[in-house]
Amino acid sequence: MSSCGNELISIIVPVYNVEQYLKRCIDSIINQTYRNLEIILVDDGATDNSGKLCDELAKLDNRIKVYHKKNGGLSDARNYGVERATGDYIGFVDSDDYIDAEMYEKLYEAIKKEDADVAECNFRFIYSNRIANYTEDNYYLILNRDEYTKEYVNMNRVFGAAWTKLIRSSLAKEIKFPKGKLFEDGFYSLELMKKAQSFVIFDSPYYNYVMRENSITNSKFNEKNLDLIEIADDIYDYVVSRYPYLKKDVARRKMYSYFNILDAIIVSPDYNNKLYYNNIKVYFHKNFLQLLINNKISINRKIRLLIMLINKKMYKKILLKHHRNLMGK
């Protein structure tokens, strides 16, 4: 089935040093069953052959527009693309990932049917040894802002990534990705959640998120990883102030973010800054009782918290084993 909707969808693809993955990504966009696309490739100062490959791909399909710019990071490249987008709707695809052929047709059908500001699908993690859907739930939900916030906080069916979404262009152009932030999607999703009025989300995993060991979000720890704590704190403060009945839920989400950073510090072989590690442990010590009695937090997670506070060496051993299994080593 092919779709030739009258409305134009602009797809923003930031490109930086991904020459071995880029063609697979762009082929998956070119082959979308929704044909009325504007494919914007933003070469963010790539130092490999990615920029040249963008130009070659543009010769094969007149829907592709290529822009070359100085390196400014992922957020800057996305903002650059959004500013130049002429579509009625805007979507994002990362250049080392790829999408199923029906993704934008189905997102467009949903956003039009429900007259929503944002449509969002499920996605898959693509590991070297396995494939896993973000959620196995079956759902098709039409949500207002308050209902979507609850889903976002609970992380059951809403991940918070830009690349699972189709967004009204007028809305997408109001929001900027924060330049220089590592977990830019979190900051962006929070602003989107504040501004959008209506959402439709469904369970089909059309986006394929490739877990590369040397990707930005899966590399050795550096201080930029602490951006995750900043956005976790921002989400917590916003939700508690506006939706106090979700305090336990958002406290759980905040705890997960702190755990993620603590784990990244522990598994990184070349990171010895004890200040950040100790600061994060202070958070867990300070909030230990509230986390322990929080009925939104699983028993397994509470056991993990106890092991981490009592025996760091044992916790690290368990964590490293889990990390190796996850990455297929």
Where are these regions (language model features)?
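Acidic helix N-cap motif at the loop->helix transition within catalytic regions
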Residues: 23, 37, 48-57, 98, ...
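Short aromatic/hydrophobic "clamp" motif used to bind/position activated sugar donors
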Residues: 90
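Donor-binding/catalytic cores of nucleotide-activated saccharide
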Residues: 74, 95-200, 210-223
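Catalytic core of nucleotide-sugar-dependent glycosyltransferases
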Residues: 206-212, 218-246, 260-289
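N-proximal low-complexity "stem/linker" segments adjacent to membrane-targeting elements
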Residues: 1-30
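Membrane-interface aromatic/basic loop that binds lipid-linked glycans or pyrophosphate carriers
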Residues: 269-329
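A conserved acidic beta->alpha catalytic loop
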Residues: 28, 35, 43-53, 70
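Glycine-rich, basic loop-to-helix element that forms the pyrophosphate-binding segment
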Residues: 69-85
